[in-house]
Amino acid sequence: MFNFFAAAPKGFEYALAKELETLGAENVRESVAGVYFSASLAQGYQITLWTRLASRIVLILFTGECQSAEQLYNAAYTIDWPSHFSNRSTFSIDFHGTGGFINNSQFGALKIKDAVVDRFRDDDLSRPDVVKGHPDMRIDAHYGRGKITIGINFSGAALHQRGYRGNTGEAPLKENLAANMLYRSGWADNPVTLLDPFCGSGTVLIEAALMACDIAPGLMRERFGFEHWRRHDQALWQQVIEEAKARASLGKTRCQLKFYGSDIDSRVVALAKRNANSAGVFDFIDFKVANALNLEPPVAEGMVLTNPPYGERLGNVTSLLQLYFQLGEKFKQSYGGWKLGLLCSDMELVSSLKLKADKQMKMYNGALECAFNLYTLHATSTRRDIPVDTTGQGGEIAAPFANRLKKNLKQLEKWAKREGIDSYRLYDADIPEYNVAVDRYLDYVVVQEYAAPSAIPEAVTKRRLTDVLLALPRALGIDPDKIVLKTRERQKGTNQYQKLDGEKLELVTTEYGCSFKLNLTDYLDTGLFLDHRLTRKLVGEKAKNRDVLNLFAYTGSASVHAGKGGAKSVTTVDMSNTYLNWAKDNFMLNGLIGRQYQFEQADCLQWIRDCERQFDLIFIDPPTFSNSKRMEDSFDVQRDHVDLLASLKKLLRPGGEIVFSNNKRKFKMDMEALAAAGLKAVNIDDKVLPMDYARNPQIHNCWVVTHG
């Protein structure tokens, strides 16, 4: 008997142990990311050829304590390497694990390499060559918890590489993961008609057909690791191969099952057909190009087993949520009596199915942790176009939110047209349970999620946000691809809600005759603060024949209004070169070209101290708080506003005005200190609060400051 280790991804251990027992393994013991077992040489060959789950099979030659580099070397040296492979064979070492005296796997591999080479030399043999590419012999070592296990990679290249895929690059779904889905779903024990509506290159269906036809997954492989092992029994191996071929031939004649696969992409369907043909199961699988949402079940009962798109495989999160929701509706409407097994890495997407799982399991697709959920599908008469409420109270998904949104849209759409604007706020946490802001930018909608109170469970906030995104397209009559989601807190884990496929989404919006460039995806803000719309307009109305200064200018939108309003000159100052370039683009959009328009990159507070010019109109919208590394001092608008305005006094000509705005809630102007500085201020909040922000009057405050 020989001792082996079958390595596999995490989450495979239970199914792999059962498979190994079925294949005749003895002393089967589950471990992390693999299973230990004992087997005869014939059984070892059989398992290597037939395992559908293992990534590699290692023939163990040594296991023992290892607390130092010397012990590691000695452990490797005790193995009689010349009895296992020739000095004319090339070899490599795959070392797994770190800790203790082993800081990195390369150090462990070098120690074992030294021991192997020395063992050959001490046996009066020339040393074998080490190669990285395709060695004749792979030595496998694993270190953990003070123990070292050294062996020979019995199987060779990764076993999930069956040989039917060809050189098509990295697959979204590895073959052994597809096999594990088949095992854990119960399909392998009770084969039924199988459908994959997102079949991609056909992996799930091909693996299922190989099982149904009793075809060993290793039959298509050209090489195995044991072929250069000196104790390899070629006659015995050939016998195992011939038996497998006979079983495959018989299995294909007996298989009565039919498999169905579809994908919306004709190119991957063509690839799936080629792969199925290479695997010898083309005749058992019906592939076609189709949209999963329009696909009807081919028979009355069966199983859907699939890995739908998620994350970067499709793009916009709202489109994904809608896809999963509509998929759940399709399953409920058309697939009553079927079973469903679904693999996905994003639980928000899974929850959008609105299906109750019978069982939930964890699997890994490479390094990506995924949920594998099993469902029993029951027929319903739910209308496809009305999302189902998750509150248990009936009606639409997020019905209060959807109704409020429709009401706001009806009021604001006509108003915006009269005002000559096409970007405005539709919803601002009007209903506390749906704690988001919804802004319309032409045909697009940006959703900003506010951080929820700590008392509300994260699962609740995630569900509500998901429901908001599901309700939006229908409530506003827009395509899901037109919705962009932003969050006001740091992204965690596998959350994909940041960009649309990593591509810029730029638009041009108009506002009271001015045009502005927007970027809806690359930054937390879009380039235009909608709540300052009337403040910008006011700056434009006050700018005629005046020298205007815009500080903390962001993308220069107030400067554009000043230029369009007939300013004699406009000076735009901001610390960010990115935003200054954006401001220049906005000036170009509006035909504002000339030396009278100046752009200066600087710490605004320092710039004020250094400036020797004077202006007739100054617009300043400082941050509520800043401690940027590029600024010499920290800034707090409540603490420092008087000093700030006093420093601007020397820049303000007699008869000039400062339009001072900030977004600090409960801000209090220190009128006494301001008067002592020779200035006076008049609050104009009621004049510059736009209608679309009337629900939130504390969004910002605004003052006109003049010489006292």
UniProtKB/Swiss-Prot annotation:
Which keywords annotate this record? Answer: Cytoplasm, Methyltransferase, RNA-binding, rRNA processing, S-adenosyl-L-methionine, Transferase
Q: Where in the cell is it found?
A: Cytoplasm
Q: Extract one GO cellular component term from the record.
A: cytoplasm
Q: Do the record's keywords include rRNA processing?
A: yes
**Pfam families, from UniProt?**
Methyltrans_SAM (PF10672), RlmL_1st (PF22020), THUMP (PF02926), UPF0020 (PF01170)
Q: Which domain of life is it from?
A: Bacteria
| The protein's Enzyme Commission number | 2.1.1.173, 2.1.1.264
* GO MF annotations, alphabetized: 23S rRNA (guanine(2445)-N(2))-methyltransferase activity; RNA binding; rRNA (guanine-N7-)-methyltransferase activity
Catalytic activity field: guanosine(2445) in 23S rRNA + S-adenosyl-L-methionine = N(2)-methylguanosine(2445) in 23S rRNA + S-adenosyl-L-homocysteine + H(+); guanosine(2069) in 23S rRNA + S-adenosyl-L-methionine = N(2)-methylguanosine(2069) in 23S rRNA + S-adenosyl-L-homocysteine + H(+)
Going by the record, the broad EC class of this enzyme is: transferase
Q: Where is the THUMP domain?
A: 43-154
Similarity remark: Belongs to the methyltransferase superfamily. RlmKL family.
Record's PANTHER family?
Answer: RIBOSOMAL RNA LARGE SUBUNIT METHYLTRANSFERASE K/L, RIBOSOMAL RNA LARGE SUBUNIT METHYLTRANSFERASE K_L
- Report the HAMAP family cross-referenced here: 23SrRNA_methyltr_KL
- NCBIfam families the record matches: PRK11783.1 (NF008748)
Report the protein's function: Specifically methylates the guanine in position 2445 (m2G2445) and the guanine in position 2069 (m7G2069) of 23S rRNA.
Q: What is this protein called?
A: Ribosomal RNA large subunit methyltransferase K/L
Q: Which organism is it from?
A: Shewanella amazonensis (strain ATCC BAA-1098 / SB2B)
Name of the encoding gene? rlmL
